[in-house]
A protein has these predicted regions:
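A general alpha-helix detector
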Residues: 1, 61, 82-85, 97, ...
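Positively charged, Gly/Ser-enriched RNA/tRNA-binding surfaces
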Residues: 1-72, 113-233
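Cytochrome P450
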Residues: 72-78
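Beta-rich nucleic-acid/ligand-interaction surfaces
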Residues: 78-88, 213-222
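Short, solvent-exposed helix-helix connector turns and helix-capping sites enriched
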Residues: 79, 106-109, 135
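Acidic, His- and aromatic-enriched active-site or binding-groove loops in soluble protein domains
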Residues: 91-114, 119, 229-232
Length: 233
């Protein structure tokens, strides 16, 4: 409904547009134990902003809302673009099952399946095991492997340092991210993900980098996050 309203009423309005919604929703599925077809959902949309800035603003908003009602949660943030790049090395018929195993944290089944299809070498399990900055360091190594030799025009760390310095020096809201001299492809996406993490630090939001966060729906293709709160999940 929010995007329908934007398309019909707000397309010509100045960008970025910040919209929010709150209401009951329904899942189109059969009744089953422990899962309700009707549920309440609150959300926001930031349309027309730059990726790292918009993503950091939305995550910081979620953190602020939780804190305002007394919820202290741990934020885990991941990047599906890298996971999908790794899965591109695997036959298409195996990808849905692998995504489901990652989502459900069925590590033993995932390990067995990767062994059976001869894909235990692609670095997926190692990446999922890493958390925090170590996960991002390993992700950058994987990006270099995906790109192959001689395809890098600028080191990831150089752009990351530039983004980090800018994030510390300027206020997060409304700033333009430093994206000078980048190449198109997996590296650019990972650079933007690192910028998002740096911007969250500038907002004062603590987060854990966790590439084990995945979503099965196809429109989830970039940064994803979850907030875990004791007693809530």
């Amino acid at each position: 409904p929010v995007m329908r309203m934007y398309v019909s009423e707000l397309q010509n309005s100045p960008k970025p547009q910040r919209l929010w919604y709150f209401g009951n929703c329904f899942r189109y599925e059969r009744p089953q134990r422990g899962r309700f077809r009707e549920f309440w959902q609150i959300g926001c949309e930031l349309i027309g902003g730059s990726h790292p800035d918009s993503e950091a603003e939305a995550i910081a908003l979620a953190d602020s809302m939780c804190r305002s009602v007394g919820i202290r949660g741990d934020i885990h943030i991941g990047y599906l673009g890298l996971i999908r790049s790794l899965l591109a090395r695997i036959a298409a018929q195996h990808r849905p099952a692998i995504m489901r195993m990652i989502d459900k944290k069925e590590r033993a089944d995932l390990t067995q399946m990767l062994d059976e299809i001869g894909c235990s070498h692609i670095g997926l399990l190692e990446l999922l095991d890493q958390k925090g900055r170590g996960a991002l360091d390993r992700a950058e190594e994987i990006v270099r492997e995906l790109e192959g030799p001689g395809k890098r025009t600028q080191p990831v760390q150089a752009v990351a340092d530039q983004a980090s310095q800018t994030a510390r020096a300027e206020k997060p809201a409304g700033r333009l991210s430093a994206r000078q001299g980048r190449q198109v492809g997996a590296e650019l996406d990972l650079q933007e993900f690192r910028e998002t993490v740096d911007l969250l630090q500038a907002y004062g939001v603590d987060c854990t980098i966790d590439f084990e966060i995945v979503r099965g729906l196809e429109y989830y293709s970039g940064t994803v996050f979850e907030i875990y709160a004791e007693g809530l999940g």
